[in-house]
């Protein structure tokens, strides 16, 4: 698919205003519009000629895999399970399902699953058996393919503990292979659609379902946090192809030949199935080893394992069914660092430095514990993206490098070009599965931001009230006139901006106001040694102290204990008269931050890269609707009396509801626009 076709199909740069149904208008003009920092931004960089390095890599072992192309169009779009009074038992907060041989269900929404009898296959590939203590959360959203739960034959009875109760006793017969229990799981994510209308179908919510469109059994799910897809409604299930399963089984067998933890890196073009394969491998290794697996996510654009604008190393001991929900900040079993951008090309040297630090953390802490490592990479394998891969593979030297491609023959010219110059011990080619999400990269990044700032605890989110209805945290900032024992925000920095070179210091507030910033704590002794390099202005003594981007790069040592990354904060506004920031940050992080500053005497640094606040958090949607309704009423009155004033109309700065003329007016803000005739 071309970049233009992808943009046409996946256009998701929704306006701050929406129609009555919460849907954004489509742009049907004949121009190519590129949204900055979308995952399609690297297209030009990929096409550019970049000299390859002359470093000779050791001759790797290339493992040939079958070149059979799986049938990627045979999607499963509905359950073949047919509910009745015998196999479908309904309770107020859970249901029990009996599956016969070869039956499966597609699950949409959020639930907790317990296997009560026998065994099941998840996504047609992951074998799990009954045990009362194995309660698995399922977070299934419309941004991804839905999980499939199918019955299967028990392989080994050892370890299986069936749960026979009065509720399911009649299902313990030869007619049924598997019994599962699905319980309600309300995390708060189901309410994100009321907070941001374009996400009203992202998670299952009975509030958006019309009764007249439902069958008798579908109507039962209106009291649950999940549903079973009983007929084709445009959903697609995750059905792992048999060829993938065979290749994964061979890979795991090779890994188990010795007891040394292995590193597996996955590369491929955009939308080729890297994240799906990474998660499939993660689940396969966890279930095969019953041991924790480490996961290094190198995609800063739309990762479900990292905070927005960050890169992370996380550890997982349970399989992930559906969407991964990151743990709250401060989790001791994960390491994150602020990168600041959504594409590696914005700060490539910083990008590589963070990845090397995260890999060292794995090498020194988690590899000795026996953790295997899975590395998921961005879809940028041409041009300068290839140069980054050259450097990263030379440093990591993965045991297994998996290339997702249209052709699984290693001798294929494109595959040979993609693998040339990379350092690895063994390589495999997997058939790519090319499927586009219903939601654009822009929308997925917005979801990541909203879920981060509205997360209350692990698997708990608050979208009941607007974030602006909460009082912001007031943090004083240090100026040239502050005392030596000042506690608060000691310095700020903007990546790629040095004073006198890229901007003037008196423009600083306009650069950081109303933005998302990374928050680092710096050891106070280390801070004292660099205080002389901070930029101050005697003429603007109300400004916070500024750290140049070049000094920031030298300051933050990602492998050092002198600095601690505390997550993200949202700068709502800056009061220059009283010298404080109004900020929002997740509630679970606020107490930890206060304790670190007051009791342990850390100094605080706020740093910004790309940091747009999501529009739903910037303005209250209800206020916009009220202004729109006020204007409608005013226009009706003015038709009868043109002299009616607008004193009763709610006024919001920088927002207008007046229609623009198509000719001579301004419809939309556009960036990097080229007409078709301008293409070369």
Swiss-Prot record:
It is an enzyme of class 2 (transferase). Gene3D superfamilies: P-loop containing nucleotide triphosphate hydrolases (3.40.50.300). Residues 51-61 have a biased composition (Polar residues). It is found in: Nucleus, Nucleolus. Its EC number is 2.7.1.-. GO terms for molecular function: ATP binding; polynucleotide 5'-hydroxyl-kinase activity. SUPFAM superfamilies: P-loop containing nucleoside triphosphate hydrolases (SSF52540). The keyword Nucleus applies. Its main location: nucleus. Residues 40-49 have a biased composition (Acidic residues). GO terms for biological process: cleavage in ITS2 between 5.8S rRNA and LSU-rRNA of tricistronic rRNA transcript (SSU-rRNA, 5.8S rRNA, LSU-rRNA); rRNA processing. Residues 38-61 are annotated as: Disordered. It comes from the Eukaryota. One of its GO terms (cellular component) is nucleolus. Signal peptide: none annotated. Belongs to the Clp1 family. NOL9/GRC3 subfamily. Polynucleotide 5'-kinase involved in rRNA processing. This is Polynucleotide 5'-hydroxyl-kinase GRC3. It comes from Debaryomyces hansenii (strain ATCC 36239 / CBS 767 / BCRC 21394 / JCM 1990 / NBRC 0083 / IGC 2968) (Yeast).
